[in-house]
Amino acid sequence: MRIKSFVIHYVIRWYVVLGFTLVSFTCFGQQEIYGLMYTDNSPVRITIQDGIITGIRKQNRLPKGTPELIIAPGLIDNQVNGFAGVSFCSPDHVLTAQGVRDATYALWKTGVTTYLPTLTTNDPELIKKNLIVLAHMKDEKNLLGSIPGFHMEGPYISPVDGYRGTNSLEYISKPEWDKFLEIYEYSMRSILQVTLAPELEGAMDFIDKCRSRGVVVGLGHHNASPVVISEAVTHGARIATHLGKGLADAVEAHHNPLWPQLSDDRLMISMTCDQFSLTPEEIRVFFRVKGSGNTVITSDVTGYATLPPGEYVSPEGDRIMLTDNGMLRYLNGRVYGSASPLKDGVANIMRVTGCTLAEAITMASTNPAVLYGLSDRGVIEEGKRADLILFRMVKSEMVIEKTYVLGNLVYDAVSSE
């Protein structure tokens, strides 16, 4: 993305404040963390040994002087296109190892302890180049396992205007397994999700092969019929990617891709629950139909997140505006993309639907962990990674005070002031 020259200084300043740029994280020995359990607000003591939760004990009260912070598993974001001035798949942004570090450290500050860098429809050579960088960084010690794999949103999506969103028509293609395998190898076999349009030629065979390799298939940016959607789910598609987005502005009232994806109980959905991507009514209806057990809250966030409000030029050459309240839009007022971190979606779905904090955390942590087979995280249980967040709910906003990744305190709001 083409962004203002001061962004580089802004990002550097972030990490001087956060203090991680050159720090090596290593968690050895035993430690204890106190907080109010997110499920029932009861005081707890969590014991950690070498980054793993070894004990969870309810307490009558928190120790004297301990702040009353809610404790929950770290958030897991399955669709991060970029963050804090870093883009994972933009033709006018060079992705570097330091860029991946910077984005990860910034996400930690927002309570995200695990995320899938997302590569959208683009030049295959750019995708390969960026996957090489990401695959190399995936296992870097200082990132503490925060990147378990990647999400490919395309290029196997609908070429029809509206359904393809901002994706370049030039690079959209039908699913071809041999070409995907080449990309898969560049990722060091770490692609965890592919989002595709099931109506494309060869899609069902492709879904079968993804399932055989443990790659989650999402349905998105498509205009498939109810029959095709049902067939795709039968073949192994598991989630509707950012439901309600990737639709044409004008769709038939009764015959469109939305209803069959909502009505199929076999299909999970992900929702972008910022205040701009979906209406409150959409969020309420989607939640009431699918429930907390079949929903993933995602951010679909872009590299504009955390940048100063102002006017920017998108990779497509459009003038866009990041407003004071965090809306990322075209100058005509239409939403361009998301610039809100996942924690904002957690707070917003609670505000809009009346769901509990426990339900919101399930959708933003537990469910994505289960979806991708990340059995070591997503809940607070003995034997799991100590990926934890401590926070306050202030006027329906989620204020992160501390973030632990594998038992390491990687963000502390007090020490960052």
Where are these regions (language model features)?
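C-terminal cap of metal-dependent C-N hydrolases
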Residues: 380-417
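Bacterial N-terminal signal peptides
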Residues: 13-24
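Conserved phosphate-binding/catalytic loop of the ribokinase/pfkB sugar-kinase fold
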Residues: 158-188
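Active-site core of metal-dependent hydrolases
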Residues: 177, 181, 185-309
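N-terminal metal-binding scaffold of metallo-dependent hydrolase/deaminase domains
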Residues: 2, 6, 11, 25-61, ...
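Divalent metal-dependent hydrolysis catalytic cores, especially in the metallo-beta-lactamase
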Residues: 81-84, 89, 101-133, 145-158, ...
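His/Asp/Glu-enriched, well-ordered alpha-helical/loop segment
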Residues: 259-269, 287-299, 305-391
